[in-house]
Amino acid sequence: INGDCELPKVVGRCRARFPRYYYNLSSRRCEKFIYGGCGGNANNFHTLEECEKVCGVRS
């Protein structure tokens, strides 16, 4: 698994509302969350497909 996918979900400290996806280690799935627009980490993907490709999720 890509190391970025092991990072915790970080919403960020700003107040924007960008729909993003992150890899949830517990469920082993990519899940939607709302990103605030600043801060955060590399476990933050624009699309479900990108998250699944990078994190190796198998359907």
UniProtKB/Swiss-Prot annotation:
Domain (BPTI/Kunitz inhibitor): give its ranges: 5-55
Describe the task this protein carries out.
Answer: Dual-function toxin that inhibits both the serine protease trypsin (Kd<30 nM) and voltage-gated potassium channels Kv1.2/KCNA2 (IC(50)=1300 nM).
PANTHER family referenced in this protein's UniProt entry, alphabetically: BPTI_KUNITZ INHIBITOR DOMAIN-CONTAINING PROTEIN, KUNITZ-TYPE PROTEASE INHIBITOR-RELATED
> Which keywords has UniProt assigned to this entry?
Disulfide bond, Ion channel impairing toxin, Nematocyst, Potassium channel impairing toxin, Protease inhibitor, Secreted, Serine protease inhibitor, Toxin, Voltage-gated potassium channel impairing toxin
List residue numbers at the site (Reactive bond for trypsin).
15-16
Answer yes or no on keyword Signal.
no
Q: Which domain of life is it from?
A: Eukaryota
What GO molecular functions are on record for this protein? Answer: potassium channel regulator activity; serine-type endopeptidase inhibitor activity; toxin activity
Family, according to the entry, reads as follows: Belongs to the venom Kunitz-type family. Sea anemone type 2 potassium channel toxin subfamily.
One GO term of the cellular component aspect?
A: extracellular region
Biological source species: Anemonia sulcata
Which InterPro entries did the record assign? Kunitz_BPTI (IPR002223), Kunitz_BPTI_sf (IPR036880), Prtase_inh_Kunz-CS (IPR020901), TFPI/VKTCI-like (IPR050098)
Subcellular locations according to the entry: Secreted; Nematocyst
> Carries keyword Metal-binding?
no
Gene3D superfamilies from the xrefs? Answer: Pancreatic trypsin inhibitor Kunitz domain (4.10.410.10)
Q: Using the chain's own numbering, where are the disulfide bonds?
A: 5-55, 14-38, 30-51
Q: Which residues form a coiled coil?
A: none
Name this protein carries in UniProt: KappaPI-actitoxin-Avd3d
